[in-house]
Amino acid sequence: FSYTVTDNIVTLNEENTKSVNVNRFLLDQISENSNDFILKLPLINESFLDVNMKKFSVLSPEHKLIIETSNGKETVDYIPNFQSYYISYEGNSIGTFLCFENSIVISYKYNNRQFEINKIDNEFLLFDINDCLISKTFSCEVEKKIEQLSAEENYPESSSASPKCLELAVEVDQHTRNTFSSNTTTTNWAHAIIAGVSQVYASEV
């Protein structure tokens, strides 16, 4: 990553928005074969934090993609085009790094502030979630899903000897589906939300 100048400000305080360049060679390398690696994570003060990245998956072998059509529900094949990593700093999980469709989404917490790196208007921006002018950010969608789960009292709890296990389904309505270019793109978005929720639950174990 490197920092660049931008006029695209998505926060009330312009100091809470930074434009970053993504090293495409690094992105390709990650997509191909990296399971664990060290990353220099960009911070809002234009410095970097050395963090550990560890690959994980939210997809089970029984994963199904079900599409509602005029003829009823259809189960279709899904070829994963999605990589997810936990971001760890000093032994603690602080966020997720998601790589799909030749792009990335990063969400992490540092110094009690929640940050996100996402592609907005064809530009990668790092911004403070709590100062953001955009209502439907990735981090906000993850928080909404967590609140929904917390309100439900019947989700499975694991024993203290084993990690928490959640079975989640994400239902996408027609309006939301039409904001994406394909079923694969829509599915990747849903998996990204689940991966974000997974990181929060994993960090609480």
Located regions from the model:
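Fold-level signature of zinc-dependent metallopeptidase catalytic domains
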Residues: T4-S19, L125, N130-V205
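N-terminal prosegments of processed precursors
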Residues: F1-K119
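Generic recognition of long tandem-repeat/solenoid scaffolds
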Residues: Y85-S88, I106-Y108, F124-I129, I134-S135
